[in-house]
Amino acid sequence: KNIYNKKNLLKIDIEGSEYEIINDIIRHNSKIKMLIIEFHWINKNKNLFIHSLKRLKLNFDVIHIHANNYRPMKNSDDIFDVLEVTMVHKKINKYRKAFRQNFPIKNLDFECFPNHKKIFFSFKN
Protein backbone atom coordinates (compact mmCIF):
# COMPACT_ATOMS: atom_id res chain seq x y z
CA LYS A 1 0.00 0.00 0.00
CA ASN A 2 1.07 3.55 -0.61
CA ILE A 3 2.10 5.08 2.73
CA TYR A 4 1.67 8.57 1.27
CA ASN A 5 -2.10 8.06 1.07
CA LYS A 6 -2.27 7.40 4.82
CA LYS A 7 -2.39 9.88 7.66
CA ASN A 8 0.62 9.31 9.82
CA LEU A 9 2.52 10.23 12.94
CA LEU A 10 5.74 12.07 12.17
CA LYS A 11 8.42 12.13 14.88
CA ILE A 12 11.40 14.40 14.33
CA ASP A 13 14.54 14.35 16.46
CA ILE A 14 17.38 15.48 14.22
CA GLU A 15 19.60 17.40 16.63
CA GLY A 16 19.10 20.98 15.44
CA SER A 17 18.26 20.36 11.77
CA GLU A 18 14.50 20.44 12.45
CA TYR A 19 14.39 24.13 11.55
CA GLU A 20 15.56 23.28 8.03
CA ILE A 21 12.53 21.06 7.31
CA ILE A 22 9.69 23.20 8.72
CA ASN A 23 8.71 24.26 5.18
CA ASP A 24 8.49 20.59 4.14
CA ILE A 25 6.31 19.75 7.14
CA ILE A 26 3.97 22.62 6.31
CA ARG A 27 3.88 21.70 2.62
CA HIS A 28 2.92 18.08 3.47
CA ASN A 29 0.78 18.85 6.53
CA SER A 30 -2.30 17.12 5.11
CA LYS A 31 -0.44 13.78 5.28
CA ILE A 32 0.41 14.22 8.97
CA LYS A 33 -2.11 13.35 11.67
CA MET A 34 0.21 13.94 14.60
CA LEU A 35 3.59 15.59 14.83
CA ILE A 36 6.17 15.14 17.59
CA ILE A 37 9.11 17.43 17.04
CA GLU A 38 12.08 17.96 19.32
CA PHE A 39 13.42 21.50 19.02
CA HIS A 40 17.11 21.87 19.90
CA TRP A 41 19.31 24.85 20.81
CA ILE A 42 16.30 27.07 21.49
CA ASN A 43 18.32 29.66 23.44
CA LYS A 44 20.59 30.12 20.42
CA ASN A 45 17.67 30.02 17.93
CA LYS A 46 14.92 31.73 19.96
CA ASN A 47 13.47 33.78 17.07
CA LEU A 48 13.68 30.85 14.67
CA PHE A 49 11.98 28.58 17.23
CA ILE A 50 9.13 31.07 17.80
CA HIS A 51 8.68 31.63 14.07
CA SER A 52 8.69 27.86 13.38
CA LEU A 53 6.15 27.15 16.11
CA LYS A 54 3.84 29.95 14.91
CA ARG A 55 3.96 28.57 11.37
CA LEU A 56 3.26 25.01 12.52
CA LYS A 57 0.34 26.23 14.63
CA LEU A 58 -1.44 27.36 11.45
CA ASN A 59 -2.18 23.66 10.78
CA PHE A 60 -1.51 21.94 14.11
CA ASP A 61 -2.62 22.37 17.72
CA VAL A 62 -0.11 21.91 20.52
CA ILE A 63 -1.35 19.18 22.87
CA HIS A 64 1.75 18.47 24.96
CA ILE A 65 5.20 19.86 25.70
CA HIS A 66 8.09 18.10 27.40
CA ALA A 67 11.19 20.00 28.51
CA ASN A 68 14.51 18.19 28.47
CA ASN A 69 16.32 18.88 31.75
CA TYR A 70 19.84 18.08 30.58
CA ARG A 71 20.88 21.74 30.99
CA PRO A 72 19.88 23.86 34.00
CA MET A 73 18.10 27.18 33.51
CA LYS A 74 20.56 30.05 33.93
CA ASN A 75 18.10 32.78 34.91
CA SER A 76 14.41 33.67 34.77
CA ASP A 77 14.74 35.02 31.20
CA ASP A 78 16.34 31.80 30.01
CA ILE A 79 14.24 29.35 28.03
CA PHE A 80 14.67 25.63 27.70
CA ASP A 81 17.33 24.54 25.27
CA VAL A 82 15.43 21.43 24.15
CA LEU A 83 11.64 21.02 23.99
CA GLU A 84 9.64 18.12 22.62
CA VAL A 85 6.37 19.47 21.24
CA THR A 86 3.46 17.15 20.40
CA MET A 87 0.88 18.50 17.96
CA VAL A 88 -2.28 17.19 16.35
CA HIS A 89 -3.64 18.37 13.00
CA LYS A 90 -6.42 20.93 13.42
CA LYS A 91 -8.70 19.00 11.03
CA ILE A 92 -8.87 16.02 13.37
CA ASN A 93 -8.65 17.74 16.74
CA LYS A 94 -12.11 17.51 18.31
CA TYR A 95 -11.07 19.46 21.39
CA ARG A 96 -10.37 22.86 19.83
CA LYS A 97 -10.69 24.76 23.08
CA ALA A 98 -7.82 26.78 24.52
CA PHE A 99 -5.06 24.61 25.88
CA ARG A 100 -3.38 25.41 29.17
CA GLN A 101 -1.36 22.98 31.15
CA ASN A 102 1.20 22.90 33.89
CA PHE A 103 4.18 20.68 33.22
CA PRO A 104 5.44 18.15 33.99
CA ILE A 105 2.27 16.06 34.16
CA LYS A 106 2.40 13.52 36.96
CA ASN A 107 2.79 9.90 35.76
CA LEU A 108 3.23 11.08 32.16
CA ASP A 109 6.37 13.23 32.09
CA PHE A 110 9.64 12.01 33.50
CA GLU A 111 13.00 13.71 33.66
CA CYS A 112 15.44 12.87 30.90
CA PHE A 113 18.17 13.12 33.54
CA PRO A 114 16.76 12.00 36.93
CA ASN A 115 19.71 13.44 38.87
CA HIS A 116 19.20 16.92 37.40
CA LYS A 117 16.75 19.50 38.71
CA LYS A 118 13.13 19.11 37.54
CA ILE A 119 11.77 21.75 35.18
CA PHE A 120 8.31 23.12 36.00
CA PHE A 121 6.47 25.44 33.63
CA SER A 122 3.05 26.41 32.26
CA PHE A 123 1.99 26.69 28.65
CA LYS A 124 -1.04 28.36 27.10
CA ASN A 125 -1.94 27.67 23.47
Locations of the language-model features?
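Rossmann-like AdoMet/SAM-dependent catalytic core
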Residues: 1-6, 41-125
